[in-house]
């Protein structure tokens, strides 16, 4: 798998983990963020490249900053 795809999968996994940690279903979180549920699912699987604007929206929904979601989950636990 190309490095770019590996990083997208890691990012998507962090987003999924944080969403679940906060108790949101995929559908509820997508609605909260104003995203389509299927789009969010593709982002979480790493099969969709996420734009900076969408990443900001997702981080707002997760109440974390971009650095937190891109560096890894241990930083989320400190919130």
What annotation goes with each model-predicted range?
Residues 1-21:
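A short, Lys/Arg-rich alpha-helix, primarily the initiator
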Residues 47-57, 76:
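Short, basic-rich loop-to-helix N-cap that marks the start of a DNA-contacting helix
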Residues 20, 31, 60:
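Alpha-helical residues within the helix-turn-helix
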Residues 13, 24, 50-53:
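Residue-level signal for the short linker/turn that defines the boundary of a DNA-recognition helix
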Residues 23-42:
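Short alpha-helical DNA-recognition segment
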Residues 53-68:
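DNA major-groove recognition helix of helix-turn-helix/homeodomain DNA-binding modules
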Residues 2, 60, 70-79:
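Short, charged recognition helix plus adjacent turn
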């Amino acid at each position: 798998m190309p490095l770019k795809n590996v990083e997208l999968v890691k990012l998507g996994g962090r987003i999924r983990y944080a969403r679940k940690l906060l108790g949101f279903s995929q559908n509820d979180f997508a609605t909260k963020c104003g995203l389509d549920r299927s789009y969010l699912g593709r982002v979480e699987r790493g099969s969709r490249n996420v734009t900076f604007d969408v990443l900001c929206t997702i981080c707002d929904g997760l109440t974390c900053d971009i650095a937190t979601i891109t560096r890894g989950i241990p930083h989320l636990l400190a919130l």
